[in-house]
């Protein structure tokens, strides 16, 4: 009895082009190949080839960032809180779905940091991981009862015990602030700081409220 081999369905040329363009955008913002593979249907070999062609080098080895605790430490928390607030805006107000909201949010963050001659504390891969942590119920945006700002916290953290890192910065930060002028927060955003005077945050350029 003659048998015929089943052939895989032909891949759409339009889908292939769309995935390739998305992969290029992701890699351009610094996404590691594992992130790209999770967002597109391109083969691993093609993703890695694109990465090498676009960056001129091999991707970093090792696992993706996996610590949710890192996002609630002082400086990362300020950056993460802003990024997540922009991401929420992109989804709810701009109507951007999924990875498009992540891409546009990170572009806003990166452009602002560049305009202030500062480096991005949070890489695109870390931001992508942050969004996954929130979607998985590990982290969330919580409102500080002191200033009304919204900050990244562990999910289901009792709000009665939560005070943001701007209202109650670590002691080492308070000592540093006494030695510095508070010019870094002269234009701190109402979306983050609420109605109280800003606390100096070295290394983080403040952004206008969205």
Swiss-Prot record:
Highest taxon listed in the record's lineage: Bacteria
Subcellular location: Cytoplasm
Single GO biological process annotation from the record: regulation of bacterial-type flagellum assembly
Gene Ontology annotations for the cellular component aspect, listed alphabetically: cytoplasm
Record has Zinc as a keyword: yes
Residues binding Zn(2+), per UniProt: 144, 147, 164, 167
InterPro entries (alphabetical): FlhC
Cofactor: how and how many bound: Binds 1 zinc ion per subunit.
Keyword set, alphabetical order: Activator, Bacterial flagellum biogenesis, Cytoplasm, DNA-binding, Metal-binding, Transcription, Transcription regulation, Zinc
Listed cofactors: Zn(2+)
Physiological role: Functions in complex with FlhD as a master transcriptional regulator that regulates transcription of several flagellar and non-flagellar operons by binding to their promoter region. Activates expression of class 2 flagellar genes, including fliA, which is a flagellum-specific sigma factor that turns on the class 3 genes. Also regulates genes whose products function in a variety of physiological pathways.
Family: Belongs to the FlhC family.
Quaternary state and interactors: Heterohexamer composed of two FlhC and four FlhD subunits. Each FlhC binds a FlhD dimer, forming a heterotrimer, and a hexamer assembles by dimerization of two heterotrimers.
Name listed for the protein in its UniProt record: Flagellar transcriptional regulator FlhC
């Amino acid at each position: 009895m003659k048998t015929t081999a089943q052939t895989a369905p032909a891949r759409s040329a339009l889908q292939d082009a769309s995935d390739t363009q998305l992969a290029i955008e992701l890699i351009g913002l610094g996404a590691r190949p594992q992130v790209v593979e999770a967002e597109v249907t391109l083969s691993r070999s093609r993703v890695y080839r694109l990465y090498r062609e676009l960056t001129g080098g091999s991707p970093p080895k090792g696992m993706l960032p996996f610590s949710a605790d890192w996002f609630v430490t002082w400086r990362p928390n300020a950056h993460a809180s802003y990024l997540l607030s922009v991401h929420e805006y992109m989804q709810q107000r701009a109507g951007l779905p999924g990875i498009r909201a992540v891409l546009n949010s990170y572009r806003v963050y990166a452009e602002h940091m560049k305009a202030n001659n500062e480096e991005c504390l949070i890489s695109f891969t870390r931001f992508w991981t942050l969004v996954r942590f929130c979607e998985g119920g590990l982290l969330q945006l919580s409102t500080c009862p002191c200033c009304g700002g919204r900050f990244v916290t562990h999910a289901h953290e009792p709000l009665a015990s939560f005070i943001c890192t701007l209202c109650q910065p670590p002691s080492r930060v308070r000592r540093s602030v006494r030695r510095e002028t508070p010019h870094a927060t002269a234009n701190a955003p109402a979306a983050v700081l609420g109605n109280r005077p800003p606390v100096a945050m070295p290394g983080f350029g403040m952004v206008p409220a969205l």
